[in-house]
Amino acid sequence: MTSTPATSLGDMDHEYNQDDIAIIGMACRLAGGIQSIEQFWNAILSKKDASGEIPEMRWEPYFRRDSRNAEILKKTTSRGYFLDRLENFDASFFGISPLEAELMDPQQRIALEVTWEALEHAGISVTSLAGSDTAVFMGVNSDDYSRLLLEDVPGVEAWMGIGTAFCGIPNRISYTLDLHGPSTAVDAACASGLVAVHHGRQALLAGESKLAIVGGVNALIGPGLTRVLDEAGAVTPEGRCRSFDDSASGYGRGEGASVLVLKRLSEAIIDGDKVLAVLKGSAVGQDGKTNGIMSPNQVAQEEVARKALSVARVDPLSVAFVEAHATSTPVGDPCEVAAIASVYGSGAGRPKDLPCKIGSVKPNVGHLEAGAGSTSLIKAVLAVSNGIFPPQANFQTPNRKMDWDNNSLEVIRGVSDWVQDRKRAGICSYGYGGTVAHAVIEQAPAPNFGPEDQVGDVVYADAAPYLLFWSAPQSQRLRETAAQLASWVGETEQPLADIANTLAYRRSQHQHRCAVVADNREEAVKLLELGSQNADSPWMIKEKVSNYGKKGAVWVFSGHGAHWTDMGKELLASEPAFYGAVSSIDNIVRDILNFSPLEALENGDLKTTDKQQVLTYAMQVGLSAVLRSKGAQPAAVIGHSVGEIAASVTAGCLTIQEGAFIVSQRAKLYRLVAGRGAMILVDLSPEDAVKELEEQGQTGAVAVAIHSSPNTCVLSGGIEAINELEQSLKDKHIQARRVKTDVAFHSPVLNELAEPLLELISGHIKPQQPKIRLYSTSLTQARGDNLRDEKYWIDNMIQPVLLTNAVKAALEDDFGIFLEVSSHPIIAHSINETIIEADSDGVIFPTLRRDKPSRKCILFALGKLHCHGAPIDLRANFSGDWTRDVPTTVWKHNPFWRKVGTGSLQPNKSVTHDVKSHVLLGAKHQVVGSDTTMWTTTLDESTRPFPGSHPLHGTEIVPAAVLLNTFLHTGEEYNALKDVILRVPVAMSAPRNIQIVKEQGRVRIVSRLQASEGENNNTESSWLTHTTGHVANNEWSKSSLDISATKKKLPSVKPSFATDYLASVGVPDMGFPWKVTEHYGEGDEMLSRVDTAPESSEKSIPWDVSSWAPILDAATSIGSSIFYKEPVLRMPAQIDEVAITPGSIPKVAYIHTTVETGMWRVNVAILNEEGHEVAHINGMRFSAVEGTPGASGSVESLVHQMSWPPAKLEEEGFQLKNVVFVSEQSDRVAAYIQDLQKRKVSTTVVPNPAGLEEQNLSSEGTIVAYLPSGSDLEEDTAKFSSTFCSEVLDIAKLLVNQKSPSKLWCITQGLFEAFSPSSLSQGPLVGLSRIIASEHPEVWGGLVDTDDESFPLQAVKYVKSVDVISVRDSVARVARLRPVPRSKIVTGREKTFTPTAEGTYLITGGLGALGLETAKWMVESGARRLILVSRRGLPPRRKWVDSNDDSAISTIRKLERLGASIHVVAADISKPDGAERLEQALDLLDLPSISGVVHAAGVLEDQLVAETTKESFDRVLAPKVSGAMALHQLFPPKTLEFFVLFSSCGQLLGFPGQASYASGNAFLDTFADFRRNQGDNIVSFLWTSWNGLGMASSTEYINAELEAKGITSVSRDEAFRAWEHAIKHDIHQAVVLRALPVEENGIPPLPILDEIAPRKRAESSGTEAVSKGEVSEKAPVPKSGPELKEYLQNAISECVAKTLRLPSAADVDPSTALTEMGMDSVMTVSLRKHLQTSLKVTVPPTLIWGHPTVNHLVKWFEEKI
């Protein structure tokens, strides 16, 4: 746009009404490389036609998808108006991960960026809209990307839902910008964009929103709709619009986005917005019943246009220009032009010689369909705002179907001026479904100038210096923005003040911020260029918003010594606020001291101490006034010495005049002692300085006057004493520097002034409580709220300045930004030392500097405050005009495009097999001169000929049933196969070419990897024969089977018998979804009822009805299970005959399997439900798969027991110097102390964690040892369990909060033996220990359980990074999981864990997911009487009819239909009376005595250790501990046949957030030991996650967390197979989990898995050799320093980039929060895995939560490496 005369207004013009809407911002992205409004306007004026060919990548998947597409796509219109790089998007700017960006419709991406640009064009800080009621209405109509992604069903992912939905476009904008107003997608076909504008207007008028973002977007990705429009004749083959032209034959489709920002005109004027145009009115209608739904309707268009004019209160004859829809269709254009003529032309009485101008933007940028209306509106706005009638592109000969001679309309051929005073335009839009929209706009109101105002060139006052801000979401972007600004600022004529204003409050303020302070344009450009080069300058600021930013800044008013000759002179002349503050105290100072502060500052008269004191105060209150006038406000204040007076004034305790009175009277008294004192700054801590004074006998003559920092202080006293002390310190090489003063401030020298000062100021001040936080440096308690009365100012004069205390208090209160308000920084260094000592990342910076330009310094300080994130009202300092011409955001685009799996097009092999028919028959070729037929196809993941998964050793293979089905389909005449040999499975590990060859009845399947083509192209060496056989057409006798009699003959077995068996031998999944619903027999004969499509009805089978593969797959799979007694994975190897009855494939069938006596040959008959045979497989032989574990081996891989091998001892032990015991005094404590004292280790005993507050836990070599001691009464178990956990948590929290180097050790005795209730109470500590070790390894030493009275010195000193240790016979041992050896199988046991029909079984947590699954399994296993105990219970049975949605009721009904009797008892056994209440409930049931108990009750409330509360912890602990003890009371040991506890392996592996849950489960494990010691038949199952069930049910996050720990979940069936397997072994704790494999020489993520994690067999290859070579040459990790930091930053950034799928580590901003870059909770688990692998350091699960950026992680790893 050449110029933008739109303006902000004072008073509204009388012709504008309250319903007028201001258009204040616009942006677009259109074909022809149009990226801005200016480029769009230039394209219109130059009549540019942006049409062209569609980019090749758009339709490429459709060429691959189906060979038939190629021919049709060649006939489809491929020309149109396309964006250059539709796939490009700046994902990182919006904090969107590459993975999510790839799954987002490009329309969402474009709309997001263009919306941002529109808001910037409007001069709105986008980030300021967060939380507002801003509305978003976006027109959208294309679902091309959605179809592309969702039709690739195997590739569908969760994010594709919102990522490709229409609603996702406005909703994504609202979500990203945190907008809370209406957010709606508008689909009105081609009218969508203008309808969205209408809805935005309505939302503003209704008061729903104060701002509306409206527009439309369109993307042309797939050919489908273009093909539709081709068929309908709507688009022209040339892909070019020719609106109003006689040659028009249809439209050219266009893509892009256009967005406008709307606000009520009255509010836009108040807000100082620059109005581009006024939306006077709009209307939307529908053409109703017409000749056809897609036929345009002239009458409807006229009606809607007149309604819009009526709403706008505009005379149609005052409208000089109409932007028509004008798609260039033969029917649409004449109809629309006639409607326009009726409303605006001759029909309205317009003279022919003054025609209404019309035009259409479509020949320039195409028909954007959903974005067409908003694009037309932008063109119209540009026309009225620039006062130009825009010329029509592609217009030569007027359309002869239009009555140009009489309609009083004229198409604009060339650029012409718009001379009317009041420029108005109409905009038309309609959709092919009948929606009609119309809008009326008017030029922006002109500004109202007063009579004295200059009209013409605006004269700006000199606002130098200038503060220019810019910011970015990531630090790397700052350079690009600086470069862009430098170039533009150097060329533009816009006033620098306007540019500064725009950047300050009309641009978004991101986390990474820069600022420069410049006196003029040349300096600004130079500084910006330095910023673009990442160089530094004294007047440049580069910061990231601090964590302390929101808290605000602490203003620190320093004391004596900051003065310099010309201080304040510049400010008196240029800052009214400064002059006002100083002048307000001038008379007071004159009266008391007989001099004028104003004159003294003007003349630089600061020679005497009294003037220095008063002028220090004057400068500070003046600077405070200036800072506040420029929008800064203190959040807290600190005063240093005399600076406390100005601090108290700033805090509201004193008036400025009271402060002046105090400082003047004090200064007058200082004249009495001037010349008698001196002060020196020394490099000694205040404590060391006191010792030094004592050594030299100077304590009476010299005082520690100022506690400057932890390592420095100021000494004050008489001149001789200071001289002597100074020399003595220098002799000791202790730095001492003179303070420029002749008064011994804050020393006994001033005692003589106390009474005179009190007398002088008494009654003259009325101190108030501070209005903001005020830290004292005169009181020992910095937060003291003492009134700043007369006594306070006496203390302030004499007592030491406790600056360090005040700064520490502020840091403890989470302040971190300090601004020294003084004429020169004199205490910044000291404050910085305190900040560093506190291990804070706080900052301190000055307001002014000696001999530097004062206004420039103040602006620099404001810039520092803002860049650190301190709240500032920027409008207070930047109050002038602004310009929308400041460049918008620089996008860093990367391509994001989902490559869908639509197959790969091969030369001459474009026809692939029919996936739904489950065959591999592709393109058919007849070999000339022979009877050989060949079919060729390509097999890969996208052409998988079966719907499920069929892995073998982790490699997906094609099921044998598909191969058999393929052979049967090689000819319609075939109904049988003979002599089938299945040699090698067809693997799907890589794309391969398949050939099916049929020759003289013999068929074979051969393949070759595509990767091998070209290498052996002329040989047969790379072709592999998989399966051979003969096809036949034989008559065969079909037998029948009496189904009912066979069922009675064979024993009933659970339906999952075959699939359970297959899973146990390593086949967890089936290639087809068949399901066994009934199963009989498990010996030499079996009968199975199979549903091949259990989720489908007879009429909706999800595959071709001609496919025999699903039922053949069930037959071959079930057939192999007949050998279950000798479990090993078997695959079909040979088949004598397969026979079928063509056309009679049943959905539900019976499979009758028999084995030939004495042979390994299986015969399978496939029968319909009447028992008639429809197919058979005879003579099927199997081959065992080498290396596949058998059934027992497979279950053994799930069930493990705990072992305790000796721990590895470190060569250099921990230097133990001090042990702080937390324990009651006891014989054990006494023995430990005596043992340690012999080894020269000091000891302290505190009775509880609170006692640690008084202990020094920061000294080297110190540990905290917690010794639990409880009661041997069983009834006290729950109480002490809670107490022990609570105390350990308190200690851990204290150490974490203090950042103490001391580690916590928990020392128990006899816990693992579990012979006493006391050891039982300690059981939860085992689980708690592992969670603390996981979340806070920095404070955890270990839990050590001992078997004697000796202190476990070996464990504490020499065992490193082990969370739990067992010391037995003085040997430290560590926990490891081991497989349960077969030698432990126990036979002939008297007791069992298997339920029977005679028993009564009780399940706690019985209505929970695991409880119900246990109930189902027990009934399946024979149980017929169950009692389900639950806290919530169920409604009375009479109400069950209304509770169909309750899964518990549904399950119970099913179990009762199976013959079981189910009783539900509502009882909370975690309560103190839980046992009694449960006993009463059982008595009422009057059932036989309980035979077995399953304790599955539990509650989960995840909380991190540092955040957990005792209430929450106990809620989780109680069901496990109190619940188990209640059952223990009801069912003493040896009174049950079995007792089963449901625990969790999470406490072994340290799952974060599960401190309470792990503690409860660890108790159950100890409880199992405790009862086992008493002869009970009990087992505790430490479960991993069950897929989709329980409190740790598998979710994406849980699965990722499990994998990070080195394990995975188990299925429900696997869990109960593990139960059955575990009961064969005499183990009391069965750990059930599946360990993930690691490399042959690799290390599992957790040491406890070391002995059970499978090892991958290393492959010897050239690639491996190269890899090893690369590893061996890898540079060593630097030891420390900058090299280590750089190494870690690169390594961690690479891990982050890998997790987020970023192009490279360079795209990772080390200071940006990972969540802002798009990382979610699942990704954090993956990142931990990458970090552990890369850096060989164990990473706590909570690390990334507490270390949110790469820089934070670098700091953590620096300490670890």
Swiss-Prot record:
InterPro entries in the record: Ac_transferase_dom_sf (IPR001227), ACP-like_sf (IPR036736), Acyl_transferase_dom (IPR014043), Acyl_Trfase/lysoPLipase (IPR016035), Ketoacyl_synth_AS (IPR018201), Ketoacyl_synth_C (IPR014031), Ketoacyl_synth_N (IPR014030), Malonyl_transacylase_ACP-bd (IPR016036)
Modified residues (O-(pantetheine 4'-phosphoryl)serine): S1721
Residue segments, region C-terminal hotdog fold: 1050-1191
Region called Disordered, residue ranges: 1654-1680
Induction remark: Expression is down-regulated by the cluster-specific transcription factor AOL_s00215g275. Expression is also down-regulated by the HOG1-MAPK pathway downstream transcription factor MSN2.
TM helices/strands, residue ranges: none
BP GO annotations: fatty acid biosynthetic process; secondary metabolite biosynthetic process; terpenoid biosynthetic process
Location of the region described as Malonyl-CoA:ACP transacylase (MAT) domain in the Swiss-Prot/TrEMBL record: 554-870
Record's catalysed reaction(s): 3 malonyl-CoA + acetyl-CoA + NADPH + 3 H(+) = 6-methylsalicylate + 3 CO2 + NADP(+) + 4 CoA + H2O
CDD domains: KR_FAS_SDR_x, PKS
Name of the protein this chain belongs to: 6-methylsalicylic acid synthase AOL_s00215g283
Species of the source: Arthrobotrys oligospora (strain ATCC 24927 / CBS 115.81 / DSM 1491)
The organism's taxonomic lineage, starting at the top: Eukaryota, Fungi, Dikarya, Ascomycota, Pezizomycotina
